[in-house]
Amino acid sequence: KVEAPEIGDDSRKFGPFIKDYSAYFMSLNRGKESIALNLKNTDDKKIFDKILSKADILVENFKPGTLEKWGYGWKDICKKYPKLIYASASGFGQTGPLKELPAYDMVVQGMGGLMSVTGQPNSEPTRVGTSIGDITAGLFTTIGINAALYDRQKTGKGMYIDVSMLDCQIAILENAIARYLSKNEIPKPMGSRHPSIAPFEAFKTKDSHVIIAAGNDKLFEKLCNLLNISELANDSKFSDNSSRAKNMDELKKILENKLSLKNTDEWVKDMEKEKIPCGPIFNIKEAVENPQVGSRNMIVKAYHKVI
């Protein structure tokens, strides 16, 4: 990981901190070895060239044109290192009228349409609770790199990969964009509700909420039987998913009337026995301490020479 001398990665200054070390930075950069180089400096360029001569992949996230100014654009690099896979991840990509503008996760969540379908109806603009603009760009970049590595096995040549954070946001809006392109409908926030599947949202119980995702007619029938309202599965307003989606509000009232009789934990146990997709809504502490998460080694202890 190449960082600017003295300044370093901005995220080194983002909290929370443990003994003046950013836990945020460490979570994003675990397993990486950092080096500080000034690519405008001749001696530092020699070090960077030595690194590139042995590298399989170069990943950069400068604004388009920055590395070109320093002599490390793709057109220059591919001549020196023809097997190198060069991946650029930026806010708006290497082409288009916005290519030279800076961007952060929040910017592309807004411009990509994601914030317009997030939150409660008629609420203020709501950011998704994680940096999904950054994360999806990283994932799409990784997919591109893997494809390029596979191609190199056959051709022996490197490849240039251009990933735009904005493009990635557009790519993940599968339902919203389909609705607009097919129906000219502009989707709006619906809280936890799915726009096309029902019941598929959070429902109130006696003590909190439970997620129910009955994604087909058989699962809905199981749910109705469990709630002792088996006749609902044969009601023309709810007998198939299309009908249920048209009558979501009415369906929710009926289901919550029954779900209010027990606590969430009780309903989860009952539904799990019937193999109905469901679950509680955990806070971060509960999610991290979930035995399932622990069994998958998602949270592990790591050694740090200072901390």
Kindly give the residue locations of the regions a language model identified:
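Conserved Rossmann-fold dehydrogenase catalytic segment
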Residues: 94, 122-132, 153-169, 188-195, ...
